[in-house]
Amino acid sequence: MPRQSGFGWAWRVPLALAGSLAAATASGYLLTRGLPLDDPLERLYAGLFGALGVGLLLLVGGLLARGPGNFAWRLGGSLLVLGLALWLLAGRG
């Protein structure tokens, strides 16, 4: 079986880990700061669990993608869904 070149595991795992950690940190910070909740503890929990969800979504998407193009489409779709969910959540406040 010939070896496949390109987006192999040597690059996939570090990129998926770095990207998911960076996105989880940024989304957790933005959720904690921007959610229209009265209780600070509720905002903290929402930010933590939101960051965990975003990080896991991007990590799994990065590890299961067949190539860089596939990963870009998955990332764009997941960010679109996340943005829509945050927009709907902010509209309730």
Curated annotation (Swiss-Prot):
Residues 1-25 form the signal peptide. It is a multi-pass membrane protein. The keyword Signal applies. The keyword Cell membrane applies. The chain crosses the membrane at residues 44-64, 71-91. This is Protein FptB. May play some role in transport of Fe(3+)-pyochelin. It is found in: Cell membrane. GO terms for cellular component: plasma membrane. Its main location: membrane. Keywords: Cell membrane, Membrane, Signal, Transmembrane, Transmembrane helix.
